[in-house]
Structure formats: structure tokens, C-alpha cells
Amino acid sequence: FGHLFRLAPIGLELARRGCQVVYAIPDVARGAALLQTHAYRILHAPVWQAPPKEHSLSQTYSKNLLRNGYWHRESLRNQLQGWLALFDDAQPDVILAEHAPSALLAARKAGLPRVAMGTGFSLPPLTAPMPGLQPWFTLPERYLIKSEKEFLECVNPVLRDLGASALTAVADVFEGAIQLLCTLLELDHYGARTDTRYWGPVIYTPQDSEAVWPSDKRDNIFVYIRPEHRFFRQIISLLKEMGLPSVTFAPGLSHEEQRALEGENLSISLHPVNLKEAATRCRLMISQGGHNAGALMLLAG
């Protein structure tokens, strides 16, 4: 939800100013449900179909892209061709890409104006080579250079086949794009940057999704963890056993499991919770790391 929620208020404001806003998202049904109050055109974004492959820990931005499909040239070609076809259909004047490097590469090939927005994770420092994803690890420069080379050897042949210019560095994914680093300095994945403007997080939350809060006081606990998380059930069981008033947002949980897990002191929502309300009703949030929710709660104290 975080990626779409970063785009939603911007799309709303652009539409208010008379722009025609077109969304391209992988899950059209879910996107339409989340954007149901707004009259947007929603297109199906290209979906990665790279075959499964074991990868080592993603220690750089390029390694993360490779493990998510960029290693497979045919899938990457299909991705870029899909975006180019989508641009031909939508005829955009500008592309606003939120953690969408393939869309940026396709827009680069098509010569379309583009804006790259995101958190520190999705907008890395544009150095050559790029730094490691885990600042607490010290990676040899030769490893960083090797990661860049591996990425370029996978991507550049595909770009050339499509008639696009090759990249000289991984940072060229963002070449020509206006960059909007939408986070706080304290939450930047790569640590504080002195040469970049921090625009702050995009705070957006559904206003019409009311949760059932067990306590009328501000002593509830808000949990935002997906059911597939390995500690999900242990956390729910512990909260129930301790009798702590809690609300859990568990996207993807079945109705049967919801009924089985709920208790007198614990309610579970299958739909996004109004986080601004949650910030006034809870004293603690347990989350698996969502940037939007974490930033909102921290700013609320």
C-alpha cells in the first residue's frame, strides 16, 4: 500500500488542478479499490515474469534489481516493451515514477520528461559505484564495482536491442529525472546526505476506514504486519495472552483466520486503517518496517 499511498495525494492534487491523471499499477483491482473515491484511469503495469533463481543477499541497489528480475534479459525486454506500449496508449506529458526503475528506463528511451520519487531505499545516492544497501557493513570498493558491472552486462544489451542508449553506471537509471527524496533525514536508508534536498514523507491514509479500538483511552497497541511474516502469529498470540488492547491491520488474512485470531482485547482489520486516527488512539506501534506508517507515527510522537 505504501507505494500507491505516496502517489495518491499527488494524483488527487494534480486532478484538482485540471490534469488528467493515469495510474499504472501491477494490481489493478486493489488499486481501483484504494482509489475508488477518485475518477482516475488505471492501467495494468507490466508484471515481472522472470523464472525463479536463488540469489545472495542484496547488498547494493543493483543487486536488488537483479534479484527482482533484471538478471533475466527476456523478462527485462518484456518489461521495457510493456512500459513503452503503455506510454503509447496513455500519451503522458510527464512520468511520475515511485520505485519504478523499469518505467524510468522506458521513459528515458522514449524521451519523456520524468520525475523519480521515493524513500531513501528507492532513491539511492547517485554515485559510481553506488554504496551498499546496509550502511552498517563496510563493502570493498571492488565488490561495489563488480555489482555495477554485473548489472550493466545484463541491462545494456537489452537497451541496445530496443534502440536505447546504454548506461555507463547504475545511477544512469535516474538520468534526466527530477528526483524527489520523500523521507526524513533520520529515516534515510543510506544515512544523512548533504547534497540532496529532503522533501519529507508523503503522509496519506484512508479517512473512511474506522477500526474497532478495544480501549477508549490512548493505551491501545497498533500492529501492522502481514500474515506471512514469520512472527505474525506469535505477536498476535502474545498480545491476546497479555490482554493488551490491540488493533492489527493484516492485509491478505482470510476471514476465517480473522475470526479465529480475534479476541476481546484484539481486533483485526483486513483493510487499511486510518493511521491518523491510530496515532491518537495507540501508545505503541508494532510494524514490519513500512515507511509511510512509521514516519506518520514518529511525527505524531
Go through each PLM region and give its residues:
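A short, glycine/small-residue-rich beta-strand->loop->alpha-helix junction that serves as a flexible
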Residues: 1-8, 228
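Donor-nucleotide binding loops and adjacent catalytic segments primarily
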Residues: 11, 191-282
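Conserved nucleotide-sugar phosphate-binding/catalytic loop shared by glycosyltransferases and other
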Residues: 16-17, 21-72
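Short, polar loop motifs at secondary-structure junctions
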Residues: 25-31, 99-102, 184-188, 249-257
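Conserved nucleotide-sugar donor-binding subdomain of glycosyltransferases
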Residues: 57-102, 143-170
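Conserved nucleotide-sugar donor-interacting segment of glycosyltransferase catalytic cores
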Residues: 77-142
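A donor-sugar binding/catalytic signature common to diverse glycosyltransferases
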Residues: 93-99, 124, 272-301
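Active-site-proximal region of nucleotide-activated glycan assembly enzymes
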Residues: 113-190, 194-196
